[in-house]
Amino acid sequence: AIRSHIDTYKGQSIDIWIELFKLQKKFSSELTLQYVALAPVEFWDTTDGEDLAKIFSSNGGILGGVIVPPFNKKNTSKFLAKMLLLASKYKLEIDLHIDESIIEPGAGIKVLLETIENLKINSIPITCSHLSSLISLSNREILNLGEKMAEKNIKVIALPLTNFWLLNRSNKTTSLKRPVAPIKQLQKSHV
């Protein structure tokens, strides 16, 4: 399978998705194309977000979002809740780019886990990409978060080369501290 993240925003034409799903069907015998609507999480609290989720329900699209600190925890939780409820309603998967940061370690995953717990939803397939700021937490904190993630069946995709390029980079020196998801610790927690 090839998963592609398509930048998505309010007011964007639905036509792009119709064309992408035509391509998906055209090549389905040779290749599985997975499309993620990568949007600000507040997008899923709009009529455009609801309409796109409906279209995705019959085409296998994936709801996507970006959660990177600093952010307003209350608003982020509200928008994540809407996204989770849409995914539950339309039987969709979620793909989040989360904690791709060198500040506020684990802030995004903590809000996600708290929101899932408050909604009492456990059956939504969720993939979290990056999680690079977790490396700044203590080993115990990583293992505790990992256990909660495993309990909710949250999958993690580490993107070390992307994070090496995006985070803590300087034109004058090579940083000795480049955050990357703590995969070994998360694996100990069965993530």
Predicted regions and their residues:
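Active-site-adjacent C-terminal substructures of enzyme catalytic domains
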Residues: 117-191
